[in-house]
Every structure is written in structure tokens, then in C-alpha cells.
UniProtKB/Swiss-Prot annotation:
Cross-referenced Gene3D superfamilies: 6.10.160.10, Ribosomal protein L20
Keywords: Ribonucleoprotein, Ribosomal protein, RNA-binding, rRNA-binding
GO cellular component annotations of the record: ribonucleoprotein complex; ribosome
Organism: Leptospira biflexa serovar Patoc (strain Patoc 1 / ATCC 23582 / Paris)
Gene Ontology terms: biological process: ribosomal large subunit assembly; translation
Family, similarity comment: Belongs to the bacterial ribosomal protein bL20 family.
Protein's name according to its UniProt entry: Large ribosomal subunit protein bL20
């Protein structure tokens, strides 16, 4: 009886790893051992950066809001406080979009918050 060497499973496992490493440079896309470690590392970076992306976007939104609010003679922190006291429930993502794409609407919101309550 011939010896079974698990050929198809072995080949499929390698093929799967090399498919994930497609587009990597040099041996990282051709050689199984280096491709395997490159795919593992890429997965770690992807996992880390999916979490990092959330804080990066929040920073971007705050920067955009701050720039737009300062054009109207107000600081970011005072603007956010005024929004809370006036009961305007808009999140930073929406405010940043308004500041970036719909300036006149954003300016109207800023003017509304400037009015004393």
C-alpha cells in the first residue's frame, strides 16, 4: 500500500497563504515561509489599524470643526460647550461634514450657539 502524504491539503494550504500574499514584493509573495510570516504581520497591522482608524477620523473631524469655528471667531471647546447647552445634538462627524461641504449651514449653527441662552 502506498504512503499517503496529504498532498492536496498541503497544496491548498500553501496556495491560500500565497494568494493572501499576492501583491507583496519579492520573496514575500513567492516563497511560502516568508509569505506566511508576511501575511501574519499584515493581519496584525490590519487588526491594529482598524481600531486606530476610529481615533484618526475623530481627530480629523475635530480639526475641521475647529478651523471652521475659528473663522467665526469662536474656539472649538466653547463651540462644543455651547452646542450642549443649547441642546443641539449633532455628532462631530456630522458637524465636520457640514463645515467641509455646507459652510452656510454650519455658519448658521455657529451663529445660533453664539446667542446667549
Amino acid at each position: 500500500m502506498p504512503r499517503a502524504v496529504n498532498g492536496t491539503i498541503h497544496k491548498n494550504r500553501r496556495k491560500k497563504v500565497l494568494a493572501k500574499a499576492k501583491g507583496f514584493r519579492g520573496g514575500r509573495s513567492k516563497l511560502f515561509r516568508t509569505a506566511k510570516s508576511a501575511v501574519m504581520k499584515a493581519g496584525q497591522w490590519a487588526y491594529r489599524d482598524r481600531r486606530k482608524k476610529k481615533s484618526e477620523f475623530r481627530k480629523l473631524w475635530i480639526t475641521r470643526i475647529n478651523a471652521a469655528v475659528r473663522e467665526n471667531g469662536m474656539s472649538y471647546s466653547k463651540f462644543i460647550h455651547a452646542l450642549k447647552t443649547h441642546g443641539i445634538n449633532l455628532d462631530r462627524k456630522t458637524l465636520a461634514d457640514l463645515a467641509y461641504n455646507h459652510k452656510e449651514v454650519f455658519n448658521a449653527i455657529v451663529e445660533k450657539t453664539k446667542v446667549a441662552k
